[in-house]
Amino acid sequence: MLKHQNYLASITLGLGILWITPAMAIEEPKYEVVTADAQFEVRHYAPILIAETIVEGDMDAASSKGFRLIADFIFGNNQQADSDKKAKIAMTAPVTVEPQSSKIAMTAPVTVEPQAEETSMKTAKTWRINFVMPSQYTLANIPKPKNNAVTLREVPSKYFIVHKYSGFNTVSRVQTKTDETVEWAIKRSYKMIGAPQLSRYDPPWTLPMFRRNEIMLEIAAP
């Protein structure tokens, strides 16, 4: 049974935008740890609903642009799914009333994935940025983005190799951690699927040794 669920006290996801008060709990995707080996885990994730956008640029520029686009959707640039009228839905605290929009609770992490068959964090120029939506939502009841650059998508249950590490996320360091993840997978004969992903959990003021970063690499069911 999928049983793991963590909560963080506050987050800006390392991209320099303040958005959650320290008292706010952040929901994370549910998963079960299948195998653990030092800084590596094989996880089985439950199905999720994500908001995503495709952006161009280097890793840092694309992360910032994609974050802002999806944050704009989450914080009000949306249309309620069950009504032609636009109305504020108070899902977080403190509540700020804005007509004609719905506010969606935040989750962690934000995920960055190179696109167009590109697996190098150093050379990729097109990226998929996504946020996992709170678990009470489905495609039927979640507010819909007004910006066509942001789309909603259901992601089925999947397996990932996850490489956990702390510190800063320079492009070179992320590539090194990605290479280590691929090497770990190859040595254990896992079948890799798609491009690696970088997931970040912490606000920018978090001390480097306390930052939580993860390289995620999808694999076939072990």
Regions found by a protein language model. Name each.
Residues 2-10, 14-222:
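A solvent-exposed interaction/effector surface
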